[in-house]
Amino acid sequence: MRVSKYLLSTQKETPANAEVISHQLMLRAGMIRRNASGLYSYLPTGLRVLRKVEAIVREEMNKAGAIEILMPMVQPADLWVETGRWEKFGPELLRFKDRHNRDFVLGPTHEEVITDLIRKEVSSYKQLPLNLYQIQTKFRDEVRPRFGMMRSREFLMKDAYSFHLDVDTMNETYEAMYNAYSNILTRMGLAFRPVLADTGSIGGSMSHEFHVLAQSGEDLIAYSTGSDYAANIEKAESPVPTEPRGAATEELCLVDTPNAKTIAELVEQFDLDITKTVKTLIVVGASEATPLVALIVRGDHELNEVKADKLDLVASPVEMAPEALIRDAIGAGPGSLGPIGLNIPIVIDHSVSVMSDFAAGANVDDKHYFGINWERDLPLAQVADIRNVVEGEPTPDGSGIYAMARGIEVGHIFQLGTNYSKSMNATVLDENGKSQVLLMGCYGVGVSRIVAAAIEQNFDDRGIIWPEAIAPFSVGILPMNMHKSHRVTDIAEQLYKDLNEAGIDVLLDDRKERPGVMFADMELIGIPHTVVIGDRNIDAGVFEYKNRRTGEKQDIPFDQLLDFLKNAVKG
């Protein structure tokens, strides 16, 4: 490709409304342009990267035995009513009517459509297992689209759905998809971690997320220093204490604490060990019989709302109770709450169950109890894992301790079981002629999100540093004063021809531009390998080569350059 015939829409200045580096660089490098909130057009450079990501995804899905199809972006609302998600999904589901007043949605996902398709097309166990995928545009009406392609309203996604009659083949397909996703990200040259994950609104049992590691990642990943164990912070299991509860050494004491509204203030004013304090959080209960539930974690720990959401007593999704409701029921406000004398159900974290001589609110404003001990001052409450893990704690596999990293979720695989097939009556006849509800798996990759995540992991102060496999161009040719030197022109054109014939994506900057502008554009758009051609190089019989990632420069003799670049591009 010649720059003179190409839409290279680079920008020097960082757009003011771009919050994260991938958004900034995708705009500056001329990859995307905003059309409306959360809606973007891909310019040539951006589309080249997107298509390379898409091609790798497609190749690995095909190798794993999945079959490509294409489903409509517009979906009939009847299917969503059938699964109950018409009401559950919320305002992210864009709903509209056609000219005949029939309800439709703009698809954020395709479980309903694929299940409807399979129940009509598959009738016998002999047709199973089956794994179908598509690469299709999705739309989610995010309340606040932000971060460019990281959280846009319209995005490109690969979603696959598998159908089974037995758990064994579902597990086999799940493992195949796990390996395919690992291969996809490995081929793209990205540092990533698969992590155990919560199934969220899609539902199901087994679930893994695939995270591209980046300091800007929204998700916190807890992983073992001694094994492959890793989990989203929402899913990471807290260790169950192995040491017995310490004996009581203090008397229960009611203390005035007028200026201690938070754990931090309580600890500072009374010189307490924070691990000897607890936080009492009041959430909405699951029934009229239990309108409020108290959740108690140690003072230095944080409540994990995903874990709390799974408690039978707690309403889903978890909702903190309003202060007025708390005061009506308990007689005190947040900051003065604790387990003694509490007239609502209590669930405590494992770490709280082994505490002794601890401090908590007294359920009277501006008062706390010090020296609280279980089974002396109050009965032991229901115990569950309801907190986030912290760095340095032992991991559940016993092979190491927790460390933390930030990641950007780009893939998610689920075992859905019968969540959708049962509600939509997707059944087949087994080998005995009996009707069986299909088991399902669901496997998603954010194709456009991978592009942004790759930038978040690969950039410097000059621009993007693309991994080889997804770079828009592999080689950039920079002829110095091309329009003034026939020698430079001839050699640049010959190299351009040779690289094209070798199947290497090459960009020839044939503009009448200053060298500084040409260098800056090549570095901004992240071309991995650049070759500089000038009269001085020609006189010396060498090309000047520069590696974008390492910054290494070297002179390559004319007769060696083509082989050198072929090897460099192959990695």
Curated annotation (Swiss-Prot):
Record EC number: 6.1.1.15
Keyword DNA damage: no
Origin superkingdom: Bacteria
An individual GO BP term: prolyl-tRNA aminoacylation
Principal location: cytoplasm
Compartments where located: Cytoplasm
UniProt keywords, alphabetically: Aminoacyl-tRNA synthetase, ATP-binding, Cytoplasm, Ligase, Nucleotide-binding, Protein biosynthesis
Coiled-coil parts of chain: none
Reactions catalysed: tRNA(Pro) + L-proline + ATP = L-prolyl-tRNA(Pro) + AMP + diphosphate
Recorded GO CC terms: cytosol
GO MF, one example: aminoacyl-tRNA deacylase activity
Assembly, per entry: Homodimer.
Summary of the function given for this chain in its UniProt record: Catalyzes the attachment of proline to tRNA(Pro) in a two-step reaction: proline is first activated by ATP to form Pro-AMP and then transferred to the acceptor end of tRNA(Pro). As ProRS can inadvertently accommodate and process non-cognate amino acids such as alanine and cysteine, to avoid such errors it has two additional distinct editing activities against alanine. One activity is designated as 'pretransfer' editing and involves the tRNA(Pro)-independent hydrolysis of activated Ala-AMP.
Family according to the record: Belongs to the class-II aminoacyl-tRNA synthetase family. ProS type 1 subfamily.
Domain characteristics, as noted in the entry: Consists of three domains: the N-terminal catalytic domain, the editing domain and the C-terminal anticodon-binding domain.
Entries under HAMAP family matching the protein: Pro_tRNA_synth_type1
PANTHER family in the record: MITOCHONDRIAL RIBOSOME PROTEIN L39/PROLYL-TRNA LIGASE FAMILY MEMBER, PROLINE--TRNA LIGASE
Protein name, entry field: Proline--tRNA ligase
Species this protein is from: Shewanella baltica (strain OS195)
Gene name for this UniProt entry: proS
